[in-house]
Structures are given as C-alpha cells and as structure tokens.
Swiss-Prot record:
Family: Belongs to the protein kinase superfamily. Ser/Thr protein kinase family.
Catalysed reaction, written as an equation: L-seryl-[protein] + ATP = O-phospho-L-seryl-[protein] + ADP + H(+); L-threonyl-[protein] + ATP = O-phospho-L-threonyl-[protein] + ADP + H(+)
Domain of life: Viruses
Lineage: Viruses, Varidnaviria, Bamfordvirae, Nucleocytoviricota, Megaviricetes
Source organism per UniProt: Acanthamoeba polyphaga mimivirus (APMV)
Listed Gene3D superfamilies: Transferase(Phosphotransferase) domain 1 (1.10.510.10)
Record's protein name: Putative serine/threonine-protein kinase R436
Known EC number: 2.7.11.1
Keywords: ATP-binding, Kinase, Nucleotide-binding, Serine/threonine-protein kinase, Transferase
Pfam families in UniProt: Pkinase
Any one GO MF annotation of this record: protein serine/threonine kinase activity
Length: 276
C-alpha cells in the first residue's frame, strides 16, 4: 500500500486506536516507522494531541516526528517517525544476567540513565510530562531514544487540557495516581516512573511490587512500602528508594538525580581506570 511518499512494509503493532508499520520513504528510500490512527476509534482532537508534543520537542534523546499525512477520504492520520537501526528496548536488555562486579556494565547502565534523565529534564523545563516512562519506551543503539508520547501532556496548553485519572502503565504509576487525588504533580510522577525503571535495570528485572491481579497491584502501590532495592550498590539503592518514595515531596528533583548519577559515574570511571 502506498500513500503520499511512503509505503507500508510490515505491521509490527495492531491496536484498536492505532496500527504501527515499518515503512519506506519512497523518495529517499529510508526506512521509517508509521503510526496509523483511525478517526473511527479515536477523535481527531485526541490524535492531534498525540502528535503535538513529539512535533515540538527537539532533543537528541527524544524521538521526533518526521512527517504526518491526513487522509480525509479514509479519516486516517499517518504519523511518520525515523526508523532507528539496531535498537533494543531497555526491557529486552539482559540485565538479569548483570554481574554487579562488572564495572564496565555498571558504567554503561548509569550512562543510559543519565541520558534518560537528560531527556526528562528537557521535557520538564518545557512544561511537558511523559506520563509513561518505562523500559519499553526507551530504545538503545549508540544512544538513548525516549519514545511513545501518546499519553504525554503539556502543562500550560489550554488547547489540550491535562488528562486526569489512572493513565500510564500500572507497575510504573506513582501512588498518588492510584490515590485519585485532585492535585497531582505530574513531573513528580514522571520521576517516580524513572525510579521504577532504575529499580528494574539494577535489580535484574525485578520490580518493587508484585501482584497477579490489577486490583491487588493497585492496593499494594497505593498502601504498601516498596521492596527495598538490592542492586549491590548501597548508594544507588538509596537513591532509587528516595525516587520511589510514596510522598511526592520527598522525591529528589530531576536535576538532583542527574547530579547523583554523574557523581556515581565518576566514581565508577575512576575504579575502572584504576583496575586497568
């Protein structure tokens, strides 16, 4: 199938509200990723909201929209992203085989986290929150790529009011979202999701809460203390537990997290060079 200057080559995701294809730019012959939104299953306003934020972001660690095409005849919107070669999501990174004594791998993971923090910091500085930070939405090749802004909000944009409710991926959603309170600081919930992502990476794919049922998971996150992080690096574990503190006001700022990670990266770098 060909529309405009793009062809659809391979379906990689099929959901009610959207389908995602690997495609080709027929002019440059470059691979692209194409999201197809259907107006029948999602309002045009909602689709425009989804593409607004990635279209205005400009950061080396954030995936940016390449193009979009509206097909009035079929009531579909085609959103085109660059295809990133040789990527792996953080979810598929084999951290369960991670040896805590391997300083090179530790340095690599900390460097990944610093790049993620850089992307979040840039977004927050521009009053944008991601709202679905998790290993699946972080891709790696030679650098980090934060993706999937379908749930993101711009905090100061009256055209697209901030969405309320339990939005996100359950295991990575902050307690205050489950509490269903009126006033939520969504920058703080992004920070919490970052903390759970760090916990996952540094605890061999384990998470601080475990439940078989959605309702049980909701209750645990809302009411129970998280299982203590045990990465083998007490300073990192202490930072992770602060980031996933149940009280949003006790969580460090994104700049404080970056400072701590850079400090730890310097220490690891010194040890690596010393051992050489």
């Amino acid at each position: 199938m060909i529309f405009s200057n793009y062809s659809l080559d391979k379906l990689i995701q099929n959901r009610k509200s959207k389908r995602i294809f690997i495609g080709t730019d027929t002019i440059t012959l470059q691979k692209v990723v194409i999201k197809i939104y259907d107006d029948k299953n999602k309002s045009k306003e909602s689709i425009l909201r989804d593409i607004h934020i990635p279209s205005i972001l400009n950061h080396p660690n954030i995936i940016k929209i390449k193009d979009y095409v509206e097909d009035l005849d079929s009531n579909k919107m085609y959103v085109i992203y660059p295809y990133i070669d040789n990527t792996i999501s953080l979810r598929n990174l084999p951290v369960d085989k991670f040896d805590v004594t391997d300083l090179f791998k530790l340095y690599y993971i900390i460097d990944i986290l610093i790049q993620v923090v850089d992307a979040i910091s840039y977004m927050h500085d521009n009053n944008i929150v991601h709202r679905d930070i998790k290993p699946d939405n972080i891709l790696l090749n030679d650098k980090v790529h934060l993706i999937d802004f379908d749930l993101s909000d711009q905090l100061d944009n009256p055209k697209f009011p901030v969405r309320k409710g339990t939005i996100g991926t359950p295991n990575f959603m902050a307690p205050e979202i489950w509490w269903k309170i009126n006033q939520v600081d969504y920058k703080k919930t992004d920070i919490y999701s970052l903390g759970i992502t760090m916990y996952y990476l540094l605890n061999k794919r384990k998470l601080p809460y475990k439940a078989k049922k959605y309702s049980e998971l909701e209750y645990q996150i809302a009411n129970h203390k998280p299982k203590i992080s045990n990465s083998g690096y007490p300073e990192l574990d202490k930072l992770i537990m602060k980031i996933i503190d149940k009280d949003p006001q006790n969580r460090p700022t994104i700049s404080e997290i970056k400072q701590k990670l850079n400090h730890f990266k310097t220490i690891v770098d010194t040890r690596v060079n010393f051992n050489e």
